[in-house]
Amino acid sequence: MLEGYRPPFDATPIHRLKAAGGQLVGKTTMDEFGFGSFSTNSAHGVPLNPFDPDRSCGGSSGGAGAAACLIPGHIALGVSTGGSISGPASFCGVIGLTPTYGRVSRYGLIDYGNSLDKVGLLSRSAASIAQHFGTIAGPDPKDPTSCAQPPLAGKGRMPSSLALPREAMENLDPAVRKAFQGALPVLRGMGVAVEEVSMPSLRFALPAYYVLATSEASTNLARYCGMRFGRREEELNQHFNDFFTGVRSEGFGDEAKRRILLGTFCRMVGFRSRYYLKSLAVRQ
């Protein structure tokens, strides 16, 4: 859909990095519009895991995770709507920071779910993450959802705590569970207060996320119609519905089509209260 497109301006995080002396090396591959968890829905091929080419880099920011692992001294930017930074960081053995919504401006970002998208960082170094987070974070008059609170980087270590939801541990792979539990004494030794809590509503998180994210995606991606945005090969001398259908059928990948259709279904008059409004209630 965006083949050959070159942005006419920099997104705010890129602008701030350049202003601080950073150099943009390139763009990394990812799932189309962020739709995926394994970077297999990319128009540019599937990125290979740095440790085992037969395994996944995660997604949707899989290329960013691989690049952060393979290129020492560099950072990579990623966008998380539902795990697209933490997933690749885990798969590629690097550190991923998914900031709180609003801490980093979304101006210039192609929206997936505009109430869920967060711009974050991946790197092999926690110090590098902290340094560059201080560069890209902060309020932006071009993004009304950005937070006015200044970044924490540079203020020294603050007392920290970790809440461990019991429900999140129920279906873990045994090896993952063992590694995670082995890290808890280390954290406690560093002064982190670890408290086990119960979050019964956690089991509704994934279905609620899918309904809300795809609903927002279906509206955000409506602009790619071949007239305002998007690649166009269809002739304009036809009925709008035929033109619109042709452009979107050819331009979007299979996963993008599935999520657009699901989001449109959830927002229809006959199903809005059953799915979309209930998901909003779960989120609140």
Regions found by a protein language model. Give the residues of each.
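Charged, often glycine-rich, active-site loop that binds/positions anionic groups
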Residues: M1, N41, G45, D52, ...
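Enzymes and membrane/adaptor proteins characterized by extended Gly/Ser/Thr/Asp/Glu-rich
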Residues: M1-P13
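Acyltransferase
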Residues: D10-T12, L172-S198, F229-R231, N241, ...
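Short glycine/serine-rich loop segments
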Residues: H15-I136
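Generic secondary-structure signature for well-ordered alpha-helical cores
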Residues: G22, P99-G102, L121-A127, G134-K142, ...
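A short helix-breaking turn/cap at a secondary-structure junction
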Residues: I95-A183, H239-G246
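Flexible, acidic loop-helix segments that line cofactor/substrate-binding pockets
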Residues: P144, Q149, P159-R166, V197-Y210, ...
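Short helix-loop capping/hinge segments that flank enzyme active sites or metal/cofactor-binding pockets
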Residues: G156-A163, S215-Q284
